[in-house]
Swiss-Prot record:
This is Putative membrane protein insertion efficiency factor. Belongs to the UPF0161 family. The keyword Manganese does not apply. It is found in: Cell inner membrane. Pfam families: YidD (PF01809). Could be involved in insertion of integral membrane proteins into the membrane. The keyword Cell membrane applies. One of its GO terms (cellular component) is plasma membrane. It comes from Nitrobacter hamburgensis (strain DSM 10229 / NCIMB 13809 / X14). It is a peripheral membrane protein. Keywords: Cell inner membrane, Cell membrane, Membrane.
Length: 114
């Protein structure tokens, strides 16, 4: 039986959804944090946007691997002796960042510093 155009479109949608599964899983964990633990702890992030919004945007833009490293770097900077202020997710992938050098995704010091 010859595959029809309709079935090949359906297969493409399934493949696209499978590739987005890790990204959506990471975003789901952030959503759960926002709606369960965050209201109990209180809204007291030192940065704008908040760390959970930053993490959600970073994972949406760069995937679970790259966005997860960006979020880890942000969480490590969000402490009493860390940075504060406006710190947006970069619009493009940081220079030198690749899947085998994930620490290059994170901004480990400063706010909006390269």
């Amino acid at each position: 039986m010859k595959p029809t155009r309709q079935s090949s479109i359906h297969c493409a949608d399934c493949a696209r959804a499978a590739l987005r599964l890790p990204r959506n899983s990471g975003r789901a964990l952030i959503w759960i944090y926002r709606h369960t633990l965050s209201p109990l702890v209180g809204f007291n992030c030192r940065h704008l946007p908040t760390c959970s919004v930053y993490g959600d945007e970073a994972i949406e833009r760069f995937g679970l691997w790259g966005g997860g490293w960006m979020t880890l770097a942000r969480l490590l900077r969000c402490q009493p002796w860390g940075t504060s202020g406006i710190d947006n997710v970069p619009a493009t992938k940081p220079p030198g960042a690749s899947w085998y050098r994930p620490w290059r995704y994170g901004r480990w010091r400063g706010v909006n510093a390269p």
